[in-house]
Amino acid sequence: MMTFIPVFLFAAQKPVTEAAQGTFSGDYVIYRDYSWKAPTWIGFLYYNDETYGAFIHTQTPEKTSTVSILFSGKIEKGQLVLTGQQIISSITPDDTFGVNYLMSLLPKLYELKTLPRAGKAPFGTATVRKQMEEFGGAAALDFQSFIPLFHLKTITGANKETALELIEIGSINGNGESVFYGYSPAEPKQDENTFSFDKTAKKETINVSGISLHLDSQWTKIADNSFLCGNTAFLTVSTVNLPPAESGNQLSASERLIRLLTASSPYVKTLLPYTIAEGTPSAFTLTQSVYDIESKKISKDIKRCIKNKDGSFTIISLTVNSYAYSAAQAYFNGLF
């Protein structure tokens, strides 16, 4: 059984300078690492400038293993210099290579991190090419500004195949450290489409907070701003007031909102390889696949985010069974 050491409380009291690039104490990233023969996931957790958490999770036919580590270090001339490590899980001699791999990769990713600016898009993107022997030599690193820590989305190796891919982001704040160190990959179970599109359903346009919803008699109003389509879909309109940006935080309002809307929790995983954001900083659509941990089912989640004059965002949110969405995509896309 894995043992967790509650380092967050004391770690948060040490220097935190990453806020200028939108990373805060407790933020984490998890990647699928395709450079390993066995299915492997790695994660990095930012406590402060001097303390990072990390894990490597590997699945083989013989066993599933996770090794968790605390790294201590210091920032010197823009580089992360590691000064110590502490294993905070069980470990076997076979795990030593994984520990050394993380110890080598963490400072390198820190050095290569790039914060792209958004411009006219909801968030910034950039591609940087570097030599990375871990991934076969010449590699292309794709960055997205809303991602914490390194802002790294993917690494494509010299063979043009994905070597490292962002799977999940989140925060241990309010969720506990086990949401990170206890990571397990999504394992969706087979589902089916129970939605039957009724072409004869009576159509009705409903206005909610200035937003026109094009519904029909298949939908039931359950609140002034919320509607239910049987067991298939849920539609709601809400207004979100973002808290003021922290001092020095360079992320725009749309980037901070996307960070919030793409974060996973102990109950739901946002499957980031399937996340798409289209539009402008003041009006964009976020399309995602979300995995319910309890039911092991995947839903399609679509959010239309519109910035208001007072700085708040109106969000039209549709969550629908993924099989039903695939079968009647035009219908669901036409709701708003």
Model-based region annotation:
Residues 13-197, 326-330:
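Acidic, serine/threonine-rich low-complexity disordered tracts
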Residues 138-142, 148, 153-160, 282-336:
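Short, well-structured beta-strand
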Residues 10-30, 181-234, 268, 296-298, ...:
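N-terminal targeting sequences that direct proteins away from the cytosol to non-cytosolic compartments
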Residues 30, 34, 46-48, 57-59, ...:
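Polar, glycosylation-prone regions of secreted, cell-surface, and some intracellular proteins
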Residues 33-37, 57-62, 136, 155-161, ...:
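Short, flexible beta-strand-to-coil junctions
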Residues 12, 30-38, 101-109, 131-135, ...:
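Short, solvent-exposed secondary-structure boundary motifs
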Residues 1-8:
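Bacterial N-terminal signal peptides
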Residues 87-111, 224-313:
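Conserved polar/disulfide-associated segments of primarily extracytoplasmic proteins
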